[in-house]
Amino acid sequence: MTADNTEAPPGPRRSDRTRTAILDAARQRFAAQGFERTTIRAVAADAGIDPSMVMRYYGSKAQLFDAALDIDLCLPDLSATPAEERAEALVRHFLHRWEHEGADDALLLLLRSAVTNDQAARRMREIFAAQVSPALGSAAKDNVGLVSAQLLGLALTRYLLRIPAVVRMTPEEIVAAYTPAVRSILEPQASAPGA
């Protein structure tokens, strides 16, 4: 009879768990209170650690805020998607993230903060320029700003301002309403009169 020496794979290191706990607490705090009213002490209390640990991992409140704003939109590469399907795929992707993934608390934090905080506004521009443009391919790169305006407008009205008419819409109704608008930006020649 042999002893079974298989062990479960190790979990995340304690330092990784601490860093994650701090970042999660910071995102929730910044989302609820904004940059100015959020304190390192409050973030530390929410994370269940000493405030000095927050400073050890992130250095300052501004650096913690910047880390909280580090977002991967997880966009699929749409450059190989047929042109007539890109708009719908993009709308569905963003809608799915906002509807189903807690990670988009960070995206909503960024959107909320970008209105009043220069650092957040800069970060929002960087994220959308660096991630949306490559996902759409070179043909659409000049229109990334307008596509972003459509998608961020949806997030603003549905998830931050919670405008009743937009909140009541089902995801399929939103896809049906937004896809033609995004398509008209991505493929202006296809939506032109007489095209």
Regions found by a protein language model. Give the residues of each.
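An amphipathic alpha-helix adjacent to DNA-recognition modules
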Residues: 19, 23-24, 36, 57-80
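Amphipathic alpha-helical segments used for helix-helix packing
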Residues: 69, 98-129
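Hydrophobic alpha-helical connector segments
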Residues: 75-108
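Short alpha-helical scaffolding segments that buttress acidic/His motifs in well-ordered protein cores
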Residues: 94, 107-114, 147-151, 155
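Hydrophobic/aromatic-rich alpha-helical bundle segments in the mid-to-C-terminal region
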Residues: 121-125, 136-195
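Basic, helix-initiating cap at the start of DNA-binding domains
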Residues: 1-52, 62-63
